[in-house]
């Protein structure tokens, strides 16, 4: 089926107390693994591409792959720009045929974040896309002093910008944790009560499963997974290389078990929040 937007999958997921997995992809294997997992679990999936890949043609190539995968599936598939850093990147996403984008203005002063996100929403909506915003910067490693979001900020931001989904800081971090994180589930619940749109949990990798389930039940309908997905890829490549001991094998055949390993991880994450 054709690619869909966040509004086609997230509101229903929130109403059901479930979430849709958003898997970061960078190449054919990761995109295929995400789709294989969705098919295996019979659930929608969000294929998202990190903003760095918009610096060259990789984001365009991934868009073509995602579109082909979606057209050959009966499942809803969203193609999403992850952590867009500028309005220009949102415009690139429009040009490349993405159906959704994130503008991450969380490092900006709050008023400036609102103003720039308003423009990002206008660009996205004019193109028939959805737009995810962010408040309360989500760091790359967990620290004692995480800048947490507040229900008041969330409500003000949503009302002022018209975003379709909102990422908030509740204690998660991108990457792998050096110690068990403090996930503020009560805060997550209060923020969800303050806004009517779906919320987004960034830093889903390595966050304890029980905490992910609790947060999803509050109204967080999009779960981002990147680091764990990529680590499985790297581990599988090393494992397969060791098996071959330098012997020749066609690359596509070599990559089959790597893709399967990624798909298994993705399927487990989908089951976790379904």
Which stretches of residues belong to each language-model region?
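Alpha/beta enzyme core
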Residues: 4-16, 28-53, 59-74, 84-195, ...
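Active-site-adjacent C-terminal substructures of enzyme catalytic domains
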Residues: 180-182, 197, 254-259
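Short glycine/proline-rich, acidic loop/turn segments that cap or connect secondary-structure elements
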Residues: 227-247
């Amino acid at each position: 089926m054709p690619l869909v937007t966040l509004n086609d999958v997230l509101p229903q997921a929130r109403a059901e107390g479930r979430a849709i997995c958003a898997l970061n992809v960078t190449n054919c294997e990761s995109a295929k693994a995400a789709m294989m997992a969705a098919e295996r679990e019979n659930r929608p999936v969000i294929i998202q591409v990190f903003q760095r890949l918009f610096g060259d043609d990789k984001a365009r190539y991934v868009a073509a792959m995602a579109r082909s995968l979606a057209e050959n599936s009966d499942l809803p598939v969203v193609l999403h720009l992850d952590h867009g850093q500028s309005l220009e990147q949102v415009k690139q996403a429009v040009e490349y045929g993405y159906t959704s984008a994130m503008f991450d203005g969380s490092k900006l002063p709050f008023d400036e974040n609102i103003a720039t996100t308003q423009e990002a929403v206008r660009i996205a909506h004019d193109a028939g896309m959805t737009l995810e915003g962010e408040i309360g910067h989500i760091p790359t490693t967990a620290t004692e002093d995480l800048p947490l979001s507040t229900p008041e900020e969330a409500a003000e931001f949503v009302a002022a910008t018209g975003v379709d989904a909102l990422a908030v800081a509740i204690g998660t971090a991108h990457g792998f944790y050096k110690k068990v994180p403090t996930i503020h589930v009560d805060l997550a619940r209060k923020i969800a009560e303050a806004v009517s749109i779906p919320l987004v949990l960034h830093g889903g990798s390595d966050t304890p499963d029980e905490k992910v389930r609790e947060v999803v039940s509050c109204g967080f309908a999009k779960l981002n997974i990147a680091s764990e997905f990529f680590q499985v890829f790297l581990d599988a490549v090393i494992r397969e290389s060791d098996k071959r001991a330098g012997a020749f094998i066609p690359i596509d055949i070599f990559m089959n078990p790597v893709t399967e390993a990624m798909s298994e991880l993705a399927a487990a994450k989908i089951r976790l929040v379904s």
